[in-house]
A protein has these predicted regions:
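Catalytic-domain carbohydrate-binding cleft regions of carbohydrate-active enzymes
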Residues: 1-319
Length: 319
């Protein structure tokens, strides 16, 4: 019989309640010191040299920067989700990452749980039977699958100089919500995305996919090396994710005062859920295009200054 268990945690202070919650679910990990600084990100940079040039430019103009982020598309054309760099654009990645380190900055790279058929990473998962039944997304609930995912990430990205992880699309079946010509009501989005998840995951555990994904990244990196602390910037999470060095961000947003207001509320709600690390895309994510304007996005730049003022007090300042 399906049931829900409720746990009540009482305390005289909010700190006391969070202490008890983390006693049950796990202590928050200490992130790399630089992770609490300024994180520069955009969609997207196209070469390893460009990443190094961004850091160099910041140093030249005297603006502090602690981390530069490589968003998606590091793979060869057509090999979505591969953790193997396109050698034409990233053949000198290790040297460029070393150059970034010499400028006292660090790097982060986007990784995805799904892979297109035809790539080496995908084929390895397919041959081992470690894919969910969309035959694209790896089964993060399987320990051996998590080990394989890390092995690929280490060999293709970590050993090539990238230092931390941007675990994108960790829902992971939110694809249908990206389609459609108009903005949907929240209940419509819930039903659409929930229905897609039910095709491939038991609804009772679907929300925990991001947690198991973070578990694999954290535990396997720590097995391989204790020289670098783990940082996982992730789009989704679940109870106890703080013990896997997860920093959540609020996802792909659009520029409006209403959306900015929501960010403040989300950040306040995240703290009592046990996650001390949360951030957002300062100034929002979406560019102006008909597709997004019709779904509620605008080109309002007025919130930008206050968005930055608010964002700089987050645990990670992601711009």
């Amino acid at each position: 019989v399906d049931q829900i268990d409720y746990y009540f945690l009482g305390g005289n202070t909010m700190d006391g309640i969070i202490h008890d919650y983390r006693y049950l679910t796990g202590k928050a990990q200490m992130l790399p010191k630089w992770a609490y600084g300024y994180i520069q990100s955009k969609e997207q940079y196209y070469t390893a040299k460009e990443l190094a040039e961004i850091v160099r430019h910041y140093r030249e103009i005297g603006v502090p920067i602690d981390c530069v982020v490589q968003d998606w598309n590091t793979w060869e054309p057509g090999n979505w989700g591969e953790k193997i760099l396109d050698k034409e654009r990233y053949g000198d990645n290790k040297e460029c990452m070393e150059e970034i380190n010499k400028m006292h900055a660090h790097s982060m790279v986007s990784v995805w749980p799904n892979m297109n058929a035809g790539g080496k990473n995908h084929q390895e998962f397919f041959d081992a039977g470690y894919l969910l039944y969309d035959y694209a997304t790896y089964n993060a609930f399987d320990e051996k699958a998590r080990e394989m995912y890390w092995k690929q990430a280490k060999e293709g990205l970590f050993d090539e100089g990238f230092e931390s992880w941007w675990c994108d699309s960790t829902e992971p079946f939110s694809g249908p919500d990206w389609n459609g010509g108009v903005k949907r009501e929240p209940w419509e989005r819930y039903e659409l995305v929930g229905g897609e998840h039910k095709k491939y995951l038991d609804p009772a555990v679907a929300n925990a996919f991001a947690l198991m994904h973070a578990k694999g990244i954290y535990e396997n990196q720590r097995k391989d090396t204790e020289d670098k602390r783990v940082l996982n910037l992730t789009r989704s999470g679940y109870a106890s994710g703080q013990k896997y060095a997860a920093m959540l961000w609020s996802g792909d947003t659009c520029a409006s005062w209403d959306n900015f207001k929501i960010q403040i509320v989300e950040g306040l709600n995240m703290g009592p859920s046990g996650y001390p690390y949360w951030t957002l895309d300062i100034g929002a994510f979406f560019t102006v295009a008909d597709k997004w304007q019709n779904r509620g996005c605008g080109c309002n730049t007025d919130p930008e200054p206050k968005w930055f003022w608010q964002g700089k007090y987050n645990e990670g300042v992601k711009d």
